Amino acid sequence: MDLKQLYREVIMDHYKNPKNKGLKKTDPYHLVHLTNPSCGDDMRVEIYVDHGQVVDVRQDGIGCSICLSSASVMSDLLIGKSVEEAQKIVQDFYSMVKGEELEDEEKLGEAIAYKGVRELPARIKCATLAWKCVEKAMNEVEDHE
């Protein structure tokens, strides 16, 4: 099996069997809702941060397989990380999908499956929508601490 096929399988697995799907809609969760008007993707991400640690990330949305699977991968990857680590992972993900080289791709875990999105510029917004939600949520939570 080649690498592209493996990446496709990761994407489809997270699309069909999403992790951390469903919102809590209660404190201490912080919700951010963003949309991609160019394609109709609609994403909600909740984050629970306690003492600088990402305790939980929940996600729910409507969209294409790239958008929804990316949300699943992102939520699974960031749980248990410090906010600082999570913010670095988000920035590394953005860099990767834009085609920039990374020092340590392994930190992205299964998110590396979206590396090929750089070849599909119209899909970059799909892949990054949930990541933009969690980035905004972390920034808003930090502002309130």
Question: Can you name each region flagged by the protein language model?
Answer:
Residues 1-145:
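Domain-level signature for proteins that mediate thiol-based redox and metal-cofactor handling
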